[in-house]
């Protein structure tokens, strides 16, 4: 009896395809609470039962957008059934991705540290000359 072999990186490929398809399907939604949404990443469980869809919002309230996307998750999943060629299409769970906010905060902290360092460097040579 032959056993099925696992296809290498299948989970990653399925997640990538879901990301592309969900991004296209979201553009078709008519809900005004869903603004300019970017799908950042998708994480699929090994059994393909659930998928976390991480998104960011350019304009609009992230909480309202998450609520609207989670309400539309059933419609989106049904549409994925028609597009994907897999046995189990995962249940979609939308989560706001704070990576861009954290990156902006870190960038501001780095800029502030560099400005402080430059100010300290300017102050030290003047103090040693006097």
From Swiss-Prot:
Matches recorded under InterPro entries: KH_dom-like_a/b, RbfA, RbfA_dom_sf
Kindly list the GO CC terms recorded for this protein: cytosol
Q: Name one GO molecular function term.
A: ribosomal small subunit binding
Highest taxon in the source lineage: Bacteria
Does the keyword section mention Cytoplasm? yes
One GO biological process from the UniProt record? Answer: maturation of SSU-rRNA
Entry's localization field: Cytoplasm
Please classify the protein's predominant subcellular localization into one broad category: cytoplasm
Query: What's one Pfam family here?
Result: RBFA
From the record, give the transmembrane residue ranges: none
User: Sorted alphabetically, which keywords does the UniProt record give?
Assistant: Cytoplasm, Ribosome biogenesis
Q: Does the keyword Cytoplasm apply?
A: yes
Indicate the family of this protein.
Answer: Belongs to the RbfA family.
Question: Which NCBIfam families does the entry link to?
Answer: rbfA (TIGR00082)
The UniProt subunit note reads as follows: Monomer. Binds 30S ribosomal subunits, but not 50S ribosomal subunits or 70S ribosomes.
Q: What does the UniProt function comment say about this protein?
A: One of several proteins that assist in the late maturation steps of the functional core of the 30S ribosomal subunit. Associates with free 30S ribosomal subunits (but not with 30S subunits that are part of 70S ribosomes or polysomes). Required for efficient processing of 16S rRNA. May interact with the 5'-terminal helix region of 16S rRNA.
Q: What is this protein identified as?
A: Ribosome-binding factor A
Query: Gene symbol?
Result: rbfA
